[in-house]
């Protein structure tokens, strides 16, 4: 399904569409030992152009999963998928189950499709998301106090994953945290070599 999405992106790009947000729902075919095939459904997402980067694309996936009321979502860096940029790719988990992968398509792969701009795609198991979706929302009264938003930046070793930092923040908040979202990773002047500054937005 990734190949199909890249072909769609390439077609839009060749038509001089400067930006696009795309999706496709389809089946993939996995051979079985009995000679037949499993045909799970997958949701493919694709985007390129102004306003699209790793963090905004990740935010879109988080919004989708939140609207489906899928709980216990986490992201882990993925470095062994040759289709994606090794530093901008992550696996998506929910409840310990792998839902899929997303990230920036490797520039060499994008070039093979005639696209010379950054492409972001996601491959998510539609069947798994359907099974894990939440039930009908339960009414909750409006909170007595408005939500509080705070931004924090954490300086850490480059080997520390964003997922590990998010988990530490959630544990430290002890149930007070409603949302946590990554919005920047900085390396450069002011930050020691081998370190990075990771910025999060918190809603309490």
What are the language-model segments listed below?
Residues 1-20, 150, 203:
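Extended, well-folded interaction surfaces typified by the phenylalanyl-tRNA synthetase beta subunit core
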Residues 2-10, 26, 58, 62:
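Predominant activation on well-ordered alpha-helical scaffold segments within soluble catalytic domains
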């Amino acid at each position: 399904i990734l190949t199909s999405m890249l072909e769609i992106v390439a077609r839009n790009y060749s038509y001089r569409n400067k930006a696009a947000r795309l999706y496709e729902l389809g089946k993939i075919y996995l051979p079985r030992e009995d000679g037949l095939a499993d045909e799970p459904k997958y949701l493919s997402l694709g985007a390129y152009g102004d306003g699209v980067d790793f963090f905004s694309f990740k935010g879109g996936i988080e919004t989708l999963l939140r609207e489906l009321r899928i709980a216990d979502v986490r992201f882990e860096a993925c470095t062994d998928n040759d289709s994606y940029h090794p530093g901008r790719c992550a696996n998506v988990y929910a409840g310990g189950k792998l839902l899929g992968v997303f990230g920036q398509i490797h520039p060499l792969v994008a070039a093979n499709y005639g696209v010379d701009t950054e492409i972001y795609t996601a491959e998510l198991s539609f069947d798994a998301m359907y099974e894990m979706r939440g039930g009908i929302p339960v009414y909750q009264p409006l909170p007595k106090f408005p939500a509080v938003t705070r931004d924090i930046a954490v300086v850490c070793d480059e080997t520390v994953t964003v997922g590990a930092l998010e988990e530490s923040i959630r544990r430290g908040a002890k149930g007070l945290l409603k949302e946590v979202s990554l919005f920047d990773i900085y390396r450069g002047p002011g930050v020691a070599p081998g370190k990075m500054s990771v910025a999060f937005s918190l809603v309490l």
